[in-house]
Structure formats: C-alpha cells, structure tokens
UniProtKB/Swiss-Prot annotation:
It is found in: Cytoplasm. Transmembrane segments: none annotated. It is an enzyme of class 2 (transferase). Specifically methylates the N7 position of a guanine in 16S rRNA. InterPro entries: rRNA_ssu_MeTfrase_G, SAM-dependent_MTases_sf. Keywords: Cytoplasm, Methyltransferase, rRNA processing, S-adenosyl-L-methionine, Transferase. GO terms for cellular component: cytosol. Belongs to the methyltransferase superfamily. RNA methyltransferase RsmG family. This is Ribosomal RNA small subunit methyltransferase G. Gene3D superfamilies: Vaccinia Virus protein VP39. The lineage of its organism: Bacteria, Pseudomonadati, Bacteroidota, Bacteroidia, Bacteroidales. It comes from Porphyromonas gingivalis (strain ATCC BAA-308 / W83). Its EC number is 2.1.1.-. S-adenosyl-L-methionine binds at residues 85, 90, 136-137, 149.
C-alpha cells in the first residue's frame, strides 16, 4: 500500500479521501488538492463562501462531492466546461485539477465569490481555469458541457443552458449537455425530462454516509 505523506498542520486533514477514490493522481494533482485546504481556510475567514461550521468538512462535502461529476463522465482533453453558479469554485476547481487538459470557465453573479474562486485557481496554478463575474445571460460563448451544484431547479437550469451548449464537435462518451449535482428526492424535478435525463447515485460508490442522498444528473441539451 502506498504510504500517504503527512499533511502540514496548517491544512485541514482530508486529502486522503480524494486519493481513496482517485488513486491515480499525479504528484502535481496531489499537491494541488492538498493546497486547497489552506487556501479555502484562509479565504473563507475573509469572505464566507462555505458555511464556517462546514469548512472542516471541505474535502468530503465540497471537493469529493464536486468530483462526483467524474462518475458520470470523464471529460476528454480539449473539452470546454462552464461551471454555472460556481460560488467559491465548486465544482469547477476540483474538476479542473482532475482534468488539467480541459478548459473551465467559472461564473457567478456574486462578485466576492468569484474573487475567491479566481484567487484559489491562481494560487493553485490552474492555467485551465478562467473566472467571470456575470449572469448566465451575459455569457457570449458556447461550451461542450455545463456543470452546476444545486444552483436551481433542473427545468430552470436547462432553459438557461440550452443556448450555451455547443452542438457541433461532439467528442465525449455522452452528447454535450448539462451535468449537475443534486440531493434529496428528485422524482418530481426530473419528471419533465424522464425520457432524456440520466441519474447516477453517488452512494455506495462513495461509501460515506454523506453521499446517501447525493446524485449526479445528466441531461443532453
């Protein structure tokens, strides 16, 4: 078994849980995930982007949860992804570490949250990440996929996202579309898309109890 190096005391423990489910990370990726703890602890004390009582659960509730999108699809190199309503950088920043050859645009309508996401991405050396303070209606680009984390109801999200999806150059295992992280009972929310949407339960693939109600929803657009 590979020995996991001791983490600096200034960083919250928890990167072991990332390596548990993603054991083939490069040394650079491991370093970036480790650095996230200290960076978010610092920035969250200045600008509240994560509940302060939840910052100790950063790796389980935020980083690993974000990486649940990779359980639905492994993005191919050259894919372009929009993280809509990124907040402080979730799910976009963990995904950008996992997929260094994929380009990510992280967008939020709240400027102080974008400031945190931008600072963290820069500190991590994520050259594949851009950030933008704007609303979805102001985005003038198209993307292969849009990801989000419980931003709004699926029907509202789909309506906003349709015009932002690139129709040509389909290169991934799933057609271009929307992938979002959801929790709780989704039957009513997914009903209008029952013939198109795919739902993936994160538990027991992620065996921690936190994930028992967590799902990934994919909708081709």
């Amino acid at each position: 078994m590979q020995e996991i190096p001791e983490k600096p005391l200034s960083q919250p423990a928890g990167t072991e849980i990332i390596e548990k489910y993603f054991p083939h990370l490069s040394e650079r990726q491991r370093e970036q995930f480790e650095q996230m703890g200290g960076l978010y602890t610092h920035w969250n004390a200045l600008i509240n982007v994560i509940s302060r009582k939840d910052i100790d659960n950063l790796y389980l509730h935020h980083v690993l949860h974000s990486l649940g999108i990779a359980r639905m699809l492994n993005f191919k190199p050259g894919t372009s992804v929009l993280d809509l309503g990124t907040g402080g950088g979730f799910p976009g920043i963990p995904l950008a570490i996992l997929f260094p050859q994929v380009s990510f645009l992280l967008v939020d309508s709240i400027g102080k949250k974008v400031k945190v996401a931008s600072a963290v991405a820069e500190a991590l050396g994520l050259d594949n990440v851009r950030t933008m303070h704007c609303r979805a209606e102001s985005i003038g680009e198209k993307f292969d996929f849009i990801v989000s984390r419980a931003v709004m109801k699926l029907s509202e999200l789909a309506k906003i996202c349709r015009k932002l999806i690139r129709r040509e150059d389909q290169q991934n295992a799933l057609p271009n579309g929307l992938i979002c992280l959801k929790g709780g009972e989704l039957q009513h929310e997914i009903l209008p898309f029952r013939n198109k949407a795919m739902t993936e339960e994160l538990w027991p693939t992620f065996e921690e109890e936190y994930f028992k109600t967590k799902k990934v929803v994919y909708l081709p657009l």
